[in-house]
């Protein structure tokens, strides 16, 4: 039966994604691949990761790095050097891939929702600001969200579902395992790991630590970006 494989922030680490899919026994043409965004920037392989995603029929939500690239593409904002190196080599077809990425993706068969960074508890997702979905890490007792790691509790600690939210964005040494939210960004591009959540057909996501047996990871081939440990040293 078809499975759903949800993978954390890839950042151009094509080799690690291929290794991870081999490890989980991904069945091309049968299993479904879902990506939490930030396919590009900081890592080594811009064209390769997009070609692999296209070949496998992957679905990806939009990450903050795709959003930044698209803002430049529509002549709204300038870019720094990391993004400029990517933006200047993307083809028309690759830009269309980025344009097609939604801010969130619902997986009703798993009672799950995939978003890049997070959701605001108590706020309907179609009423939430795009910035929150793309960048939030924490949220305070007033419901004010922030991209700063020390601005309040992790948003997942305050979210009470349903649906279960699967997200990325905040690179940490280990996955975030909250009751109703699972964070998969384990910092592959910084020399950490690339992590997948593997679900059987129609399988709901277990809550909290119970999800751990469904998580599979591979170690980065090397650090591609940042200083010693990058954000994983926090």
Model-derived regions: residue spans:
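Beta-strand-turn-beta hairpins that frame and shape the catalytic cleft
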Residues: 1-5, 106-113, 178
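Core catalytic region of metal-dependent phosphoesterases/phosphodiesterases
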Residues: 3-7, 13-80
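Active-site environment of divalent metal-dependent phosphoester hydrolases
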Residues: 11-15, 41-43, 67-70, 121-122, ...
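Glycine-rich phosphate-binding loop signature in dinucleotide/nucleotide-binding domains
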Residues: 24-30, 107-109, 159-161
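Active-site neighborhood of divalent metal-dependent phosphoester bond hydrolases
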Residues: 46-150
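Acidic, His/Gly-rich catalytic cores of divalent-metal-dependent hydrolytic chemistry
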Residues: 125, 130-234
């Amino acid at each position: 039966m078809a499975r759903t494989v949800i993978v954390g922030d890839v950042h151009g680490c094509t080799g690690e994604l291929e290794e991870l899919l081999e490890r989980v026994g991904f069945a091309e043409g049968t299993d479904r691949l879902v990506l939490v965004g930030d396919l590009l920037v900081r890592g080594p392989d811009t064209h390769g990761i997009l070609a692999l995603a296209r070949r496998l029929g992957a679905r990806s939500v939009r990450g903050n790095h795709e959003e930044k690239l698209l803002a430049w593409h529509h002549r709204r904002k300038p870019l720094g050097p990391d993004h400029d190196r990517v933006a200047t080599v993307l083809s028309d077809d690759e830009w269309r891939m980025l344009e097609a990425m939604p801010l969130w993706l619902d997986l009703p068969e798993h009672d799950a929702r995939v978003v890049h960074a997070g959701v605001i508890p108590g706020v309907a997702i179609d009423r939430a600001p795009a910035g929150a979905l793309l960048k939030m890490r924490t949220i305070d007792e007033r419901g004010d969200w922030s991209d700063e790691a020390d601005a309040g509790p992790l948003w997942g600690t305050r979210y009470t579902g349903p649906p279960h939210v699967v997200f990325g964005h905040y690179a940490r040494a280990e996955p975030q395992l909250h009751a109703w939210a699972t964070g998969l960004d384990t910092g592959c591009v910084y020399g950490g790991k690339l992590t997948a959540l593997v679900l059987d057909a129609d399988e709901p996501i277990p809550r909290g630590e119970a999800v751990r047996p469904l998580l599979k990871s591979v170690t980065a081939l090397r650090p591609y970006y940042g200083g010693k440990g990058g954000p994983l040293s926090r």
